[in-house]
């Protein structure tokens, strides 16, 4: 996602209206910040900024998950929180956010929540996903559920990786240029990354440098696309989606990326 500044006046304006609601919440909400580094007992209430954090939370074993920013909002920083959003934060045990989403702290402050703020590293690289899911499970007290999810995830990832390698044109790993936040999809395909770009716009110098590497594929971030990245290079551009759907399931993100990559490599 783009690192954009966020407008938060709506959050601050609504905080006064929710002051009494937050102040009258149950004791669990007011003490949820205690023992923050210790595993929990019972199932936590989790508020997440987007479906990406939500999918990590679900994979870790959380069940009571509230997503603040609807999937239909292309740029999450453009979203103005509603009173119901702030009320949910006031009752949460955990609030998950990414470091490029500074409004998460403002939401927590405005709602008067005692929830634990948890910064999540959003990257679909399998090693990073496994590490984050395991860390969250430790906080939530849901290690068994997370371990079960990881078993299924590892099996599906291995299958997709083998399928994509079997689809390599001429049996050789394709050379790719990838946006920095879609590098995980190059790894999924077993592709050879010859260059990266973004999140800033590609400069003329970068355009010349990347085109000279003669990639067969360009992996573009669907959430930050600026159009054709390497025009006249002959490379096929593949749109990669990072964010899960409203079902908060990470696996379709990998399946969809694999389908797009196979199509670009000439395999239906």
Q: How would you label these PLM feature ranges?
A:
Residues 44-45, 128, 213-268:
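Structured C-terminal subdomain patch of bacterial secreted/periplasmic proteins
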Residues 31-33, 39-60, 68-80, 223, ...:
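Extracytoplasmic "Venus flytrap"
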Residues 46-48, 53-57, 145-198, 202-210:
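Basic- and aromatic-lined ligand-binding clefts that recognize polyanionic substrates
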Residues 109-176, 248-268:
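Extracytoplasmic substrate-binding proteins
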Residues 61-82, 182-208, 239-250:
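Alpha-helical, coiled-coil/dimerization segments enriched in small aliphatic residues
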Residues 7-16, 24-45:
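Short, low-complexity, disordered segments immediately C-terminal to signal peptides
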Residues 64-143, 227-235:
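Acidic/His-rich segments in extracytoplasmic proteins that coordinate ligands and/or metal ions
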């Amino acid at each position: 996602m783009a690192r954009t500044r966020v407008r938060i006046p709506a959050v601050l304006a609504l905080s006064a209206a929710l002051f009494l609601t937050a102040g009258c919440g149950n004791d669990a909400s007011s003490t949820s910040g205690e023992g923050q580094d210790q595993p929990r007992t019972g199932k936590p209430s989790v508020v997440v900024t987007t479906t990406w954090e939500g999918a990590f939370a679900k994979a870790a074993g959380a069940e009571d998950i509230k997503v603040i920013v609807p999937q239909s909002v292309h740029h999450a920083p453009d979203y103005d929180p509603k009173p119901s959003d702030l009320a949910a934060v006031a009752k949460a045990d955990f609030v998950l956010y990414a470091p490029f989403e500074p409004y998460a702290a403002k939401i927590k402050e405005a709602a008067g929540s005692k929830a634990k703020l948890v910064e999540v590293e959003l990257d679909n690289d399998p090693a990073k996903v496994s590490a984050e899911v395991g860390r969250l499970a430790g906080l939530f007290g849901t290690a068994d559920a997370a371990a079960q999810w990881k078993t299924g995830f590892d099996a599906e990832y291995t299958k997709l990786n083998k399928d994509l390698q079997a689809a390599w044109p001429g049996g050789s790993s394709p050379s790719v240029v990838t946006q920095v936040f879609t590098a995980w999809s190059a790894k999924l395909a077993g592709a050879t990354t010859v260059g990266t770009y973004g999140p800033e716009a590609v400069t003329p110098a970068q355009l010349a440098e990347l085109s000279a590497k003669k990639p067969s594929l360009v992996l573009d971030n669907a959430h930050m696309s600026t159009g054709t990245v390497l025009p006249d290079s002959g490379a096929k551009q593949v749109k990669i989606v990072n964010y899960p759907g409203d079902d908060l399931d990470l696996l379709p993100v990998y399946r969809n990326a694999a389908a797009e990559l196979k199509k670009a490599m000439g395999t239906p």
